[in-house]
Every structure is written in structure tokens, then in C-alpha cells.
A protein has these predicted regions:
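RNase H-like nuclease fold core
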Residues: 456-521, 525-536, 552
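Helix/loop segments that flank and initiate small ligand/metal-binding modules
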Residues: 95, 465-472, 479, 483-487, ...
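Basic, alpha-helical interaction scaffolds
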Residues: 231-308
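RNase H catalytic domain
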Residues: 161, 306-319, 483, 523-600, ...
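Family-specific functional microsites
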Residues: 569-577, 671-770
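Short, conserved micro-motifs composed of acidic
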Residues: 108, 194-240
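Conserved pre-catalytic core of RNA-dependent polymerases
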Residues: 1-129, 133, 166
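Catalytic palm active-site di-aspartate
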Residues: 26-30, 57-67, 93, 119-123, ...
Length: 770
């Protein structure tokens, strides 16, 4: 219960701190909706904006020593009270930190308990937000918030800080940083904190030579940072490589070191995965693909938003270097040879090429930027681009037009999303959400057994009986439905009402980027109608589980404003009446008359939509980007140099298989075809690419070895011979041409490998090769 209570308090304090701007703009750690990449982007924006106009940038990195254990409890409570938190909360914090004890255990030996009533527990839910609020006092004293940003600023991620400034001279930068560093040391000392001066670092970023004809850097002498503190002189020498929050910066902003570091780290991780299995044993290929995408890709692509550009323009050398890790991982997942084309391996594993993965992550950060609050440091940096008046009229030295900007914020900014988001709306505040206020007057039942199971049939029968009883009662029953047609990009909603033994129909079109968006609109329209009509205790049947589970979730997500409107409408109704609302799941196309009728109304609503509906929503942006990436992958797949010269056209659902991005059916096709068996998948992959232990493979790569079939010495052991003519195996089909045109050739393919367990294995090799 104690941990649950601290989590509740932490969520409330995080929300209030962000909603009321209680923290310094430069604080990115321990704060909701902030990440390390935010700090990196803001810093790079400052560096690029300055150096394009001929100003050098200098950064001083600091580390607050013993941060969590050094927080003074009395000072913490005073800070919370000063910031406006309730007295009950400050009193709770004061009592929460006292009378704490801890013990140390070494094997079976346990120490006596001793007092631990100082600082904040580092793993506690409250520690990040309390420490951030406490530290903000000192930061605001040295870097006070103002409408006009200063030439010298700071960033803090928990206790890792960075002071940065820009000017025409590095010597000026050093003097300014020294003065601000001393001011910060004094401010931190006043609240009982100190900087670990031995970890202080300095780095200079060179500006462009504005007088040069080409984009060249003005490399100049790099002075050291000197200051005096506690009667001791300190000299901080500039570094050639600076690591901050996992990003590696150099004075020239060359990302080679960063990319090489994470490529090596990813390579070490993926090579260690060999302990989990190889081509004949170990975990299944589906689990391998999941592990690679969950554990290794995030490491390999960490910080890619800082340097990557769409389609890899201008950074191809970095992408090529990282592809070595991706290629090795695809071979481990599929059990194929090193000579197998990497494109074919990725298609079989259901994982796109690395260039597409980087583009998708780039898109993901674009999406994140559009959903941030207007007061977020990334949004304010972009919306209110402040340039020092001394260099405002200087023509920036930018990259050639055919190359993307050096500034990641300019690359990431997009105006394609016009949907509005409100991260800190009052209805999103923990404790003030609709289900927090009226938990017993709103009923949501999204349960249903798995479709096709015996339990589902019994459950559906009981649901139909309960609906029949409801129809004979006096309650108002509302069936809602929404639909989105991907090909035409049209969305429609409908709801039908059974009331007083008669039906009332409502339908129309709506902007939508997915079925989820349309379903949320349908629920909103139905709820609004019920409240306007003063319906008491209505019951809603909804055929979309995702919409049913989240239509009152007002967090940032697609259709957030619609969920906020639903919450506000219901809140007003519940405050002014004693009515209750019930929402239940009803599967579509299951023989429920009201649900089927709503589905027909939705199709009528589609006819009202314009020929080219507006595409302004977040879902539209994500769908369009995903489609472009799918097209890109399929264009690559048509190239023989990508998938190999001898790829076989296997079919899925009677159509020639084509890869698709974020499509489960396409991603899992080869895993399901092989039954998630690594031995079977590796044999299939070798055969479909013709990179298998056969005589044909030896002819191309090992010409000195035997190339004839062991079972048929008069014939060369080619893939066609093994599949269709070898006397050792039952044939796949009458001929390769007939198999390629067979609409169910994937089933024949699977049957062949299940019956012929040694086909395309090393067991087929002649004796002189073993």
C-alpha cells in the first residue's frame, strides 16, 4: 500500500508541476513528457543556430554530487509549500521522510538496522519529482525565466547539468561560463548541494567561417575554463569528445564517433545472442525477432533523431556502418548463410531494412513533438526561435539545398498534423478524471472470450438473451459504430437508439485516420444525444474494444480532444442528475440486430463524405508515413540485388507475398509457415533464396567440391532437382513453373519440408565434404 500511495502522489505532483510550470524550462529529467533526446535536440538547435552565424558555442557539463542523499527534508517541505502545494501534502512529505531505517545484507549475513532519515530513496516513485522541484529553486535563481531567452542557458537531466553560451570568441565564452558556474555553485550550496568538480567537463563547438566560399569551420585555439572555489583553483581543459546523456558530441558535430560507439555496442549484444540459439536449436525465430527489436535496435539507433534525415540523405555512411549489425542479426534470426542477401533475410524475418527503421523512428519523434504541450522546451524553442540581436541580420551559412539542415529541430518540425492536443487539461488530472469522480455511476464492460472458442459462443448466446430482455424493459439502448475505409480515406459514424419499442437512426461522415477515430466520434455523438435528451440510465453497446477501453482516457493520443469532450459532457450530466451510464462490448457481425443495423447505417454515412476528405489528424500522418515506408520496402523488394537473383515467388492468401511495414500478417508469415521452428525456417529460407548446402551453391562459391546429387549421381544437385526430381524426396510439384502459379503454393511448400526432413540440410552433402 505504501508504494501504491507514493505512486498516486507522484503522478499528481508530476501533473501539477508540468501544468503550472513549477519547474525550470531546462529541466528534462524526472519530469513527465521529457526525455534525453529533448535535451540533445535543444542543445543542438542552439549550437547550430549560433555557428551558422559565425558564433562559437561552449558547454560546461556538471554533476551534482550525492544528489538524492543530500536533499534536506526541511528545505524540501518549505520548497513545496512555497510552490503552492497543499499543506496536507507538505505535512505528509515531512512525516514520510522521518524514522526510516535500512539494513545491509551480504549472503546470509544481515547488518543491524540503522537510521536512514536523510535524502530521498533513489528508487522511490516520489524521488524524481521531489528532487526536480528542489533543484529548480537554485536553477531559477541563476537562470531566471524570462520572455527573452538569454545567450547563456542551462539544461539539467536529474543531476547532470550543462551550461552553454555562444559568442564570437571562445575566450569570452569561457569567462561567461566561469561566472555562471560560480553563481550556480553558490546557489546550490545555499540549499545544501554541491557539484562534483572532478567530473566537470568543457567542450567548444567551432563556428562556420562566414567569409569562406564553402562551408568550413573556423578552427581556433580552445581555451581552458578556470575558476576559484573554496580557496582552490580549478582548470577544466576542453575535450575532443564529450558524452552527455549517452550522446557523443565533438567540436565539429561529426557523429562518426557516436555511430561507431553504438554500432560496436549493438554488435557485442547481437553476437552474445548466439548463446540463445543457432540454426538447429534454441529459442524460436519469432522470439529472436522480438528480442532483437526490443533489446538491440533501441541501443543501435539511440540518438538517431539528432543526426538522421529522411531516406538517409547526407548520412549514408553512418547507415551503412550500422547495417553490419542488422545483417548479422537477420542471419541469426533466420538461420541463413552469410552469403544470403540481407534484403531477403529481413523479409523472411519480417523486419524492414535499417534505413526504413530509422525513418520510422524519425517519424515517431515527429509524432511526439506534435503532441507536446506548448510550454515544452522543444515546442517553445521551435515556436519562439530567439536569435541574439547582434547576429539576427547575419545570413546563416547553411548546407547546400539538396542536403537536409544540420539542425535536428528543423528536420523534425512538420505542419502536416493539425489535430490539437491538450496534455494538461483539467479532465486529465489524476484524481479529477471522470472515473475517479464517479466510479460507481459509470460502468464499462469490455470482457469477451476469444472469438471462435467454445466460451465465446456461450458468452454470445448469453449476451443476445440479455439484450432481448433489455429490449422488453424501459431502458434506452444505444448501438454505436464507426468505420474507416483505408483506400478512400473516408470515415463515418452512426448510432441507433431503441426506445419505447421504436428505432431512431443517426449517421454521418467524420474526419478520421483510423477505425478507432471513427468509433470515438460515434461514441461522442451518442453520448451527447443521450445527455441532450435527458435519458436516464442509458446502456451503450460498442463493437470496438479499443474504443470502449479508452474513450474516457484523456491522455495524449489520437482523438484526445474527442475523449475530453466526452468526459466533459458526462461530467456535466452526472453532476446535475442522478443518472448512470453503462457501456458494454458487443462484437460486430455476430447476429445482434441493433449492432448490424448500426453497421449498415455507417455505410450510408460514408456516402455523405467528400471525395477527398481532409487529412489533418495524427492518425492520417502516421498512416501516410507507414504507407510510404511500405512502398519503399516493396520497391526495394522488386530489385534482384536486394532479395537475390533466385528468390521464389511464394504466395500468401493466394497472392504473391509482398512485405509490409507494421502489418502483423505480413511480419509473421514465415514464422507461421514454419510453425516458429528455427530448423524448418532456416531450411525454407535457404531454399527460397537458393543459398543452401547444395551442389548449385558449391558451383558458385566452392567450385572445387563435389556438385552432384548423392542420391542421383548423374544429375547436378540444384534447387530445382531437389524440389522436383530427386528420387530421395517426394516432389514439391510437377514443375517449378506450375508451383509458382499455384495459388496455394505456400501450403505445398510447408508440406514438402515437413515430409522431407533432410532436404536443404548438411545431411545432403557428399561424404568428401563432411
Amino acid at each position: 500500500m505504501g508504494k501504491l500511495l507514493t505512486k498516486v502522489l507522484a503522478n499528481r505532483m508530476q501533473f501539477d508541476a508540468a501544468a503550472y510550470s513549477l519547474l525550470h524550462d531546462g529541466q528534462c529529467g524526472g519530469v513527465r513528457k521529457h526525455a534525453t533526446i529533448d535535451a540533445g535536440i535543444v542543445l543542438l538547435d542552439f549550437i547550430n543556430t549560433s555557428r551558422e552565424r559565425g558564433w562559437h558555442t561552449s558547454v560546461c557539463a556538471i554533476d551534482v554530487a550525492q544528489f538524492f542523499p543530500s536533499l534536506n527534508h526541511a528545505a524540501v517541505t518549505r520548497v513545496l509549500a512555497k510552490l503552492g502545494f497543499a499543506k496536507t501534502l507538505t505535512n505528509l512529505m515531512a512525516s514520510y521522510f522521518i524514522d526510516r531505517q535500512t539494513v545491509y545484507r551480504w549472503d546470509s549475513a544481515t547488518s543491524d538496522p540503522f537510521d536512514f532519515s536523510f535524502g530521498t530513496p533513489q528508487g522511490d516513485c516520489l524521488s524524481p519529482i521531489i528532487s526536480a522541484l528542489f533543484l529548480s529553486v537554485a536553477i531559477k535563481h541563476v537562470f531566471p525565466p524570462s520572455l527573452t531567452p538569454k545567450s547563456t542557458r542551462c539544461l539539467f537531466f536529474v543531476n547532470d547539468g550543462a551550461l552553454y553560451t555562444a559568442s564570437p570568441s571562445l575566450a569570452t565564452n569561457v569567462r561567461v561560463l566561469s561566472a555562471h558556474l560560480l553563481s550556480l555553485l553558490i546557489a546550490l550550496a545555499n540549499i545544501g548541494l554541491a557539484i562534483e568538480l572532478s567530473k566537470t567537463e568543457l567542450i567548444h563547438f567551432f563556428a562556420f567561417q562566414l567569409s569562406a566560399s564553402s562551408q568550413s569551420l573556423a578552427r581556433t585555439h580552445q581555451p581552458s575554463l578556470t575558476f576559484r572555489w573554496n580557496d582552490e583553483d580549478f582548470v577544466i581543459k576542453p575535450s575532443n569528445v564529450w558524452r552527455y546523456l549517452g550522446f557523443f558530441f565533438t567540436p565539429t558535430l561529426d557523429w562518426t564517433y557516436h555511430v561507431h560507439y553504438y554500432t560496436n555496442k549493438g554488435f557485442s549484444s547481437v553476437r552474445a545472442c548466439s548463446m540463445l540459439g543457432n540454426s538447429i536449436r534454441g529459442i524460436g525465430p519469432k522470439q529472436r525477432a522480438l528480442g532483437y527489436q526490443a533489446c538491440i535496435l533501441p541501443v543501435l539507433t539511440y540518438g538517431s533523431a539528432l543526426w538522421h534525415a529522411p531516406q538517409g540523405v547526407g548520412v549514408i555512411k553512418h547507415v551503412k556502418h550500422m547495417e553490419r549489425v542488422h545483417s548479422f542479426a537477420m542471419g541469426w534470426i533466420t538461420g541463413t548463410f552469410r552469403t544470403t542477401p540481407i534484403g531477403a533475410r529481413g523479409v523472411i524475418a519480417g523486419i524492414p531494412p535499417l534505413c526504413i527503421i530509422l525513418d520510422l523512428r524519425f517519424c515517431g519523434y515527429q509524432v511526439r513533438l506534435t503532441t507536446l504541450d506548448d510550454r515544452h522546451i522543444c515546442r517553445t524553442t521551435w515556436s519562439h526561435r530567439w536569435i541574439n540581436p547582434r547576429i539576427r541580420d547575419v545570413r546563416p551559412r547553411t548546407r547546400p539545398r539538396h542536403l537536409p539542415s544540420d539542425n535536428p529541430l528543423e528536420r523534425l518540425a512538420t505542419d502536416a498534423v493539425r489535430e490539437q492536443f491538450f496534455p494538461f487539461h483539467a479532465s486529465s488530472r489524476p484524481g479529477d478524471r471522470l472515473l475517479d469522480l464517479f466510479p460507481h455511476r459509470i460502468s464499462i464492460d469490455a470482457y469477451s472470450p476469444k472469438k471462435g472458442s467454445t466460451l465465446f459462443k456461450a458468452w454470445l448466446s448469453d449476451l443476445a438473451k440479455s439484450i432481448t430482455l433489455l429490449h422488453s424493459s424501459t431502458r434506452t439502448i444505444i448501438y454505436s459504430d464507426g468505420a474507416y475505409w483505408n483506400k478512400t480515406a473516408r470515415g463515418a459514424y452512426s448510432f441507433t437508439v431503441f426506445r419505447d419499442n421504436r428505432w431512431q437512426d443517426f449517421f454521418g461522415w467524420c474526419p478520421a485516420g483510423s477505425s478507432f477515430d471513427a468509433e470515438i466520434v460515434a461514441i461522442e455523438e451518442a453520448v451527447q444525444w443521450a445527455c441532450i435528451q435527458n435519458i436516464n440510465d442509458p446502456i451503450f453497446f460498442i463493437n470496438n474494444k479499443a474504443a470502449l477501453s479508452s474513450f474516457l482516457d484523456t491522455r495524449v493520443r489520437p482523438s484526445q480532444m474527442a475523449t475530453i469532450r466526452i468526459s466533459e459532457i458526462l461530467k456535466d450530466r452526472l453532476i446535475n442528475s442522478r443518472s448512470s451510464f453503462s457501456f458494454r462490448y458487443c462484437p460486430s457481425h455476430s447476429g445482434i440486430d441493433g449492432n448490424d443495423h448500426a453497421d449498415r447505417l455507417t455505410k450510408r454515412g460514408t456516402a455523405l463524405a467528400p471525395v477527398t476528405p481532409p487529412r489533418l489528424l495524427l492518425s492520417d500522418f502516421i498512416n501516410d508515413y507507414t504507407k510510404r515506408m511500405t512502398i519503399h520496402w516493396r520497391v526495394l523488394f522488386t530489385s534482384r540485388s536486394f532479395k537475390g537473383q533466385q528468390w521464389l515467388p511464394i504466395r500468401r492468401q493466394k497472392k504473391v507475398f509482398k512485405p509490409a511495414v507494421r502489418n502483423k500478417a505480413s511480419t509473421n508469415f514465415f514464422f507461421e509457415l514454419s510453425g516458429n521452428d528455427i530448423v524448418l525456417l532456416s531450411r525454407m529460407a535457404r531454399a527460397i533464396t537458393n543459398h543452401a548446402p547444395t551442389g548449385d551453391y558449391r558451383r558458385r562459391f566452392l567450385p572445387d567440391l563435389e556438385q552432384h546429387c548423392p542420391a542421383c549421381p548423374q544429375h547436378a544437385q540444384t534447387r530445382t532437382h531437389v524440389l522436383f526430381h530427386c528420387s530421395r524426396y517426394s516432389p514439391l510439384h510437377t514443375s517449378l513453373t506450375n508451383w509458382c502459379h499455384d495459388r496455394n503454393n505456400s501450403k505445398l511448400w510447408k508440406t514438402f519440408f515437413q515430409r522431407n526432413t533432410t532436404a536443404f540440410t548438411f545431411g545432403d552433402l557428399p561424404d568428401d565434404v563432411h
